C-alpha cells in the first residue's frame, strides 16, 4: 500500500508539472499573438485517483484532461487546433530561448509548409543545461532547405514530429493524422507523408534548438520509450511497411533515411529483442534497399559483416557474429579488462561452488579504508564470535588498525580474490552500493549500513542527476532489491530511505549507526589524545574540524569530484594560530589533492585518516557545509558552524535539501569568511543562542545512538541464522 502511495505521489507531481507546462505554453502562444480560447490536454496514461482535485483546479485554466494514447491525443490536438500553425512539443521537453519564434519567422519568410530545427537529447532541467555547448554539438548549421543530405542527416536516427512547426491548413487539406493502430511508432507514417507532400517547401534553422529530455526515473515515471514492452520488432516492421507504400522511387532521400532507421533498429535490438519469426523480415527489407551500399558505409567493419550476412538471409551465421560484436564492444576491444575475465570464472566456476555461510564479506567506501559502520560491526563480531566466522575485508591498501584485530583475509577491490570471495560468502556488509555486476546468490544475507543521515536529496527524491550515471535511479532500485537489511540512525532517515530507495520499511533496522558507538565509549578522552598524537596535533590547542563535501555540478568523472578550498586558511591562521589548529577532512569522493605546506603547523590534513569517527573525538568545533558529518558530530553535543558560501545556489538549483537549513540546523549558516572569523571569536554566544535548537536537533537525529548499535545489528542479522529463524527466501 505504501509503495502504491509513493508511486501515486510521483505521478501526481508529474501530472502537476505537465499541467503547469501546458498552461505556460498557452501563455507563450498568446504572447506570440496566436489565436485560441482554450487548450485541452490529453495524456498517454491513466491518472491516479488523487489527481481529481488537481484536474478540477486546472480545468478552468486549460480546458479538460482525458487519458488516451499518444497518437489519439495528437489527432485530437490537430482536430481542435484553430491557429495558423500547429507545433509539437512533449511536456518534459523544452526549447532554447527564441527557438519557436525563429521557426515562425522562417516559415513566414520562406512561405514554408513546415519548419524545424536541431534536436538535442539531455537528462537535465533547463537550469542545469548548457545551451551553448549543445548548440556547438548539433549537426545542422544556419538556415537550409530540408532536402538532400540535410534531410538524411535529420531523420536517420528517429522519425518524430517533435519540433515541427506545420501550416495547419496543409494538415487539413491532406488529412494528415497519426496511426492509432501502433503504440510506439505512430510518428513514422505521419512524418513520411508530411515530408513527401511538402517536398521543396520545408526549411530548417540550425539555431532553433529543441531539447528532448530523458526521464531518469524509469521505475516510477518511465517515458513511452522506456516502458517495458517486450518485443517491438513486429510493430516497427508494420510501420516501416506502411511507410514504403507512401514513398515513391523518386523519394531517394526519404527512402535512405527510412532504411537507415531500420538498420539502426535491427543493429541495436538483434538478437535479444527481435522475435525469431521477425528476423527474416528484416533480412528481406535489407535485401530490397536500393541504396544498400551507401547505407552500410555508416557502420564499422564488424557491423558491416554482421549486417551483410543478415541481408543474405544467413541468420544462423549472423547471430554469433552479432553476439561477438556486442561482446567486443562491451569489452572495449578484443581483450577486455581483467575484471571482465574474472567474471567469466565467477559465472562458470565460483558461483557453482558451495556457498559458505560462515564467511563474511566486508567493504567500506569501495575498499578505500578500514572505517565506518562496517569496521565497528566487524570488531563486534570479532569480540563476540571470534573464529566462528571467516572475515574477508575489501581493502586496497594495508591498514595498521585492521592488522591489530583478529584473524582476517584482505583482498583488493576487483581483484581475482575479490570476485572469488564475493561469489562464495554467505554474508555481505557494505556501506555504499555494491557493483552492478556483483549480484548476490540465493541464500546470501546482505546488510547495507549506508553511510550517513541524509541532508542532500537521494536517489528517487532527486530530479536531475548531474554527475552520476543517468541510470542512477534504476541501478539504485535494482541494488536495493538485494539488500536484506538497511540500517537507519533515526526515524527521519527511515522515512527518507523508504521513499528515496523505494525500500520496504519492515527491512529497515532503526538501531542507530554502529560507527557512532565510539562516540559514547567510556575511554573517548583517551582515544582523542591518541588521535592527536597520531596526527602530530599539539596538546592544549583548540581543534577546529573542517569537513566540506563535494558539489554535484563540479566533477571530472563519475565518482571523481573537483574541490575548491573556499575557507581562507591564511586568515584563520593569522586570527587563531596561537591557540587553535584546523583539522581538514574532505569527502572520500573528492579527487583533488590539496597542497597545505604553507599552513604547516596550523592545518592538519585528516582526509586520508581511515576513521572519521575518531577525528570527531579529537575535535572541539566542527565546520561543515552540506556534509552529513554534523549529524554524527552532534552526538558529542559540541558546537557546529555551517560555512555555506554557495548556499542559495546549492540548495535551490543543484540538489536540494531534506530540511530547512535556516530553521533546523543546530548552528549558524555562514556565507563569508568574515562571518566564519567572527563566529570563531564568539563561540560562547553562539552556543547560548542555539542551545534550544541543538537540543531539539539531538532528540530528533541522535537519540537512538547510545553506544550499542553494533550489538543490536549483529544480534539481529547474525542471530537469526544462528537461531534458525532466518527467512532465506527474503
Question: Language model features by range: what are they?
Answer:
Residues 455-556, 693:
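A nucleotide-sugar donor-handling region in carbohydrate enzymes
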Residues 369-385, 514-596, 670-672:
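Conserved catalytic-core segment of nucleotide-activated headgroup transferases in glycan assembly
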Residues 86:
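Short aromatic/hydrophobic "clamp" motif used to bind/position activated sugar donors
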Residues 70, 93-231:
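Donor-binding/catalytic cores of nucleotide-activated saccharide
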Residues 597-601, 628-701:
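Catalytic binding pocket for nucleotide-activated donors in carbohydrate/polymer assembly enzymes
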Residues 51-56, 62-81:
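Glycine-rich, basic loop-to-helix element that forms the pyrophosphate-binding segment
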Residues 428-457, 609-654:
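A donor-sugar binding/catalytic signature common to diverse glycosyltransferases
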Amino acid at each position: 500500500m505504501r509503495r502504491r502511495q509513493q508511486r501515486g505521489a510521483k505521478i501526481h507531481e508529474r501530472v502537476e508539472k505537465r499541467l503547469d507546462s501546458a498552461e505556460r505554453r498557452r501563455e507563450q502562444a498568446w504572447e506570440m499573438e496566436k489565436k485560441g480560447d482554450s487548450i485541452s490536454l490529453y495524456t498517454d496514461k491513466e491518472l491516479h485517483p488523487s489527481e481529481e482535485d488537481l484536474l478540477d483546479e486546472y480545468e478552468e485554466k486549460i480546458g479538460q484532461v482525458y487519458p488516451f494514447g499518444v497518437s489519439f491525443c495528437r489527432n485530437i490536438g490537430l482536430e481542435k487546433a484553430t491557429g495558423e500553425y500547429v507545433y509539437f512539443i512533449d511536456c518534459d521537453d523544452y526549447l532554447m530561448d527564441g527557438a519557436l519564434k525563429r521557426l515562425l519567422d522562417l516559415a513566414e519568410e520562406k512561405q514554408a509548409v513546415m519548419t524545424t530545427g536541431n534536436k538535442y537529447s539531455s537528462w537535465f532541467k533547463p537550469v542545469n543545461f548548457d545551451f551553448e555547448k549543445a548548440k556547438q554539438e548539433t549537426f545542422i548549421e544556419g538556415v537550409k532547405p530540408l532536402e538532400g543530405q540535410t534531410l538524411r542527416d535529420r531523420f536517420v536516427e528517429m522519425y518524430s514530429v517533435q519540433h515541427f512547426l506545420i501550416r495547419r491548413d496543409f494538415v487539413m487539406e491532406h488529412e494528415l493524422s497519426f496511426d492509432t493502430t501502433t503504440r510506439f511508432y505512430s510518428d513514422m507514417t505521419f512524418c513520411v507523408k508530411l515530408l513527401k507532400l511538402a517536398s521543396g517547401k520545408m526549411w530548417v534553422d540550425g539555431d532553433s534548438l529543441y531539447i528532448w529530455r530523458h526521464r531518469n526515473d524509469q521505475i516510477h515515471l518511465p517515458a513511452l520509450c522506456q516502458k517495458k514492452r517486450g518485443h517491438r520488432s513486429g510493430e516497427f516492421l508494420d510501420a516501416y511497411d506502411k511507410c514504403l507504400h507512401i514513398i515513391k522511387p523518386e523519394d531517394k532521400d526519404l527512402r535512405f533515411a527510412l532504411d537507415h532507421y531500420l538498420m539502426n533498429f535491427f543493429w541495436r535490438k538483434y538478437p535479444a529483442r527481435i522475435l525469431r519469426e521477425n528476423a527474416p523480415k528484416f533480412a528481406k527489407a535489407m535485401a530490397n534497399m536500393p541504396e544498400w551500399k551507401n547505407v552500410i558505409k555508416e557502420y564499422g567493419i564488424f557491423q558491416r559483416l554482421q549486417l551483410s550476412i543478415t541481408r543474405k538471409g544467413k541468420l544462423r551465421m549472423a547471430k554469433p557474429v552479432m553476439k561477438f560484436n556486442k561482446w567486443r564492444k562491451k569489452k572495449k576491444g578484443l581483450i577486455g579488462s581483467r575484471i571482465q575475465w574474472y567474471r567469466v570464472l565467477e559465472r562458470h566456476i565460483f558461483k557453482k561452488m558451495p556457498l559458505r555461510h560462515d564467511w563474511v564479506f566486508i567493504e567500506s567506501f569501495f575498499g578505500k579504508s578500514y572505517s565506518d559502520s562496517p569496521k565497528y560491526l566487524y570488531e563486534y563480531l570479532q569480540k563476540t564470535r571470534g573464529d566462528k566466522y571467516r572475515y574477508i575485508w575489501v581493502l586496497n591498501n594495508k591498514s595498521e588498525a585492521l592488522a591489530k584485530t583478529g584473524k582476517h583475509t584482505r583482498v583488493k577491490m576487483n581483484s581475482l580474490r575479490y570476485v572469488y570471495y564475493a561469489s562464495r560468502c554467505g554474508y555481505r556488509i557494505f556501506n555504499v552500493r555494491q557493483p552492478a555486476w556483483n549480484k548476490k546468490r540465493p541464500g546470501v544475507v546482505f546488510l547495507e549500513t549506508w553511510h550517513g543521515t541524509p541532508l542532500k536529496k537521494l536517489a528517487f527524491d532527486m530530479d536531475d542527476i548531474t554527475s552520476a550515471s543517468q541510470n542512477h535511479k534504476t541501478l539504485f532500485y535494482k541494488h536495493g532489491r538485494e539488500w536484506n537489511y538497511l540500517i537507519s540512525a533515526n526515524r527521519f532517515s527511515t522515512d527518507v530511505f523508504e521513499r528515496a530507495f523505494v525500500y520496504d520499511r519492515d527491512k529497515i533496522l532503526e538501531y542507530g549507526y554502529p560507527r557512532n558507538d565510539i562516540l559514547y565509549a567510556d575511554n573517548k578522552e583517551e582515544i582523542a589524545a591518541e588521535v592527536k598524537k597520531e596526527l602530530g596535533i599539539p596538546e592544549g590547542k583548540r581543534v577546529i574540524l573542517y569537513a566540506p563535501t563535494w558539489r554535484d555540478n563540479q566533477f571530472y568523472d563519475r565518482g571523481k569530484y573537483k574541490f575548491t578550498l573556499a575557507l581562507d586558511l591564511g586568515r584563520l591562521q593569522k586570527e587563531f594560530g596561537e591557540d587553535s589548529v584546523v583539522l581538514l577532512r574532505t569527502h572520500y569522493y573528492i579527487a583533488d589533492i590539496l597542497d597545505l605546506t604553507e599552513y604547516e603547523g596550523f592545518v592538519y590534513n585528516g582526509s586520508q585518516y581511515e576513521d572519521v569517527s575518531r577525528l570527531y573525538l579529537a575535535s572541539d568545533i566542527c565546520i561543515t557545509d552540506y556534509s552529513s558529518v554534523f549529524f554524527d558530530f552532534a552526538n558529542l553535543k559540541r558546537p557546529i558552524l555551517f560555512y555555506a558560501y554557495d548556499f542559495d545556489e546549492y540548495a535551490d538549483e543543484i540538489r536540494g535539501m531534506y530540511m530547512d537549513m535556516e530553521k533546523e540546523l543546530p548552528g549558524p549558516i555562514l556565507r563569508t569568511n568574515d562571518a566564519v572569523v567572527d563566529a570563531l571569536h564568539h563561540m560562547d554566544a553562539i552556543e547560548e543562542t542555539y542551545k534550544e535548537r541543538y537540543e531539539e536537533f539531538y532528540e530528533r537525529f541522535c537519540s537512538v545512538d547510545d553506544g550499542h548499535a553494533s550489538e543490536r545489528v549483529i544480534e539481529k542479522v547474525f542471530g537469526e541464522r544462528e537461531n534458525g529463524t532466518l527467512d532465506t527466501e527474503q
